[in-house]
């Protein structure tokens, strides 16, 4: 059922918020031993919040659009009084004294927190295997990864542990796990949603967005979290439209650009290619016009990203030194030794690798050759998108080059892991909105996702196209059996 359908049932008295929350907590308790999707479960808080919503409803009070609905939050978003660990030993005991803007808006709309979800440490990874608290598994097949870095949020929605969740997307960390777990994942335009209270990885790339079971639910969450925030200087002041209003509108005559380079990318799985091409044909059957477009520098995105993102991470993570908060090494001989040991023991291998890459790229003698050159290529990638949007309304690609890979498959090959974000990274570099929608299954029964990319602040059109495709394709009518997916 959609958020809208649950809201109507709650308003009609067909179910109480407490019953709805208890149902999802029961699913969470059943699936969590197999999935490890959560860092912390807030069952007591969830039940108390649900009871308060029921009491307010009985008293005839006005309630928010998400009143009594169980949601989960990626554990790199600050939640006052609830641990925010970034799945790192460095922040294992950190309890924020303040609430992030997006979670504050969710609680203001009446949403109920069921827990904080697992992620790759400090959101650096594509499989949710680098978490200090153990890897998350894919609900469709626990031998496979859920994607990353927001794998816990994607797995939580797919397993029915919550109605929807929030994640963050720096290079594909919402869309790729959405594809792997068979849910909808939306990365808004950079600046559409406040980053205040999001633990920073790469500040010019990070963006918060929703995971949901359907496009309409993603639109509902975006409606609540979008909008200007004075505490985030990068947050846009543009008005927030009604994202649900145009979902039912026809897409007849809309121009959908099929990016040539994405379907010619090295390593693109044949089943993924066929499934996404079939989805493009479905859009054409709905009246959209398919247009072949070229973004010549699209596949340069990954090399560009792995200079810019680690450089920003190197600067952002310099604050973790064991002095004011975070992990502190014991019995150090000096301040310098304490700082060095705290960082060596508090950060995992992947985080340390990216800090080293970024520090090198920013070092004297190399900053021009690497960091500034990468920023120039980033500008060229953005111009390619600008040129494409002169011809079309939305762009279409696969979300990921393959379905979910097996756990441990890329453990000794960081480059192979990085390539899982080949098709999502350019969108972050350009600051554009994009959504991953389930579009089929592999022969092994693993979900496949289609990525739709919109122009700046054109989330409404993106959601419209995604919703129309979702309704027509009815992908889950032929879904395979999976014991952990309701």
Curated annotation (Swiss-Prot):
Q: Which InterPro entries does the record cross-reference, listed alphabetically?
A: Amidase, Amidase_CS, Amidase_dom, AS_sf, GatA
Q: Which PROSITE patterns match?
A: AMIDASES
List the GO molecular function terms.
ATP binding; glutaminyl-tRNA synthase (glutamine-hydrolyzing) activity
Q: Which reaction does it catalyse?
A: L-glutamyl-tRNA(Gln) + L-glutamine + ATP + H2O = L-glutaminyl-tRNA(Gln) + L-glutamate + ADP + phosphate + H(+)
- Keywords, A to Z? ATP-binding, Ligase, Nucleotide-binding, Protein biosynthesis
Q: What is its EC number?
A: 6.3.5.7
Protein function: Allows the formation of correctly charged Gln-tRNA(Gln) through the transamidation of misacylated Glu-tRNA(Gln) in organisms which lack glutaminyl-tRNA synthetase. The reaction takes place in the presence of glutamine and ATP through an activated gamma-phospho-Glu-tRNA(Gln).
Designated name of the protein: Glutamyl-tRNA(Gln) amidotransferase subunit A
Supply the source organism for this entry.
Parasynechococcus marenigrum (strain WH8102)
Organism lineage string: Bacteria, Bacillati, Cyanobacteriota, Cyanophyceae, Synechococcales
Q: Which gene encodes it?
A: gatA
